[in-house]
Amino acid sequence: LPADLPDREVAELAFQRRRTQTGSDFLPPQLQKVAVISCVLRSDDGLKIFSLEGPEAEVIQRFYDGLEKYVPQLVSWNGGGFDLPVLNYRALIHGLDASRFWEPGRNNYYNRYQDLHLDLMDVLAMFQPRNNAALDEVAQLAGLPGKIGVGGAKVWETWLAGEVAKVRDYCEVDTLNTYLLYLRYQRLRGAFTKEILDRETQLVRTHLSGLDKPHWREFLKLWNDS
């Protein structure tokens, strides 16, 4: 392809090829470009919701650097099926250092059946793909807001329109829905008492009430109304 071909046209060619191959224009992980990584961090210092933004290689490296520094338990929804393969392929392409992620041991990030990375959807489905469920549906069934704003199918168009903040907000909302379901999971498996679950959930509500951003105001309103 010509080096000066606009991104939109390059992507459309890739979409057309993918539709011909599979009937869907959803690109394989190695062809996905990382625009933002959103995180909820719960530590002894409290709760933080934040996003990593910038050039793709920088965003991915900062994510892996965070694993190196904090060695957190990663919690995702289909992270083993999509998010982490995307990050790993793109890190490989950029020649990045993700050594902590790949560090072997009895508990590591890449083993499906260990805890350092908990793919919540995969675990709840008992590692049977036929039982997989959409984050939005499970979140709403649990009385959470689910997805708001941009839908996943519109992320590319929104990004092309330069509405980066909308993409970031979409990712942050997904991340918080996942975290709130994780709190329920901790109760489900007996790691939390009801009192701890209620306290951790209230911590999220209190944190959101102090964030003066439209997507969090909408999230909190929908949550309170549910």
Describe these PLM feature segments.
Residues 1-66:
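Conserved RNase H-like, two-metal-ion catalytic cores of nucleic-acid enzymes
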Residues 32-53, 67-169, 173-196, 202, ...:
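Metal-dependent phosphoesterase core characteristic of DEDDh/y 3'-5' exonuclease domains
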Residues 206-226:
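Acidic, Ser/Thr-rich low-complexity intrinsically disordered segments
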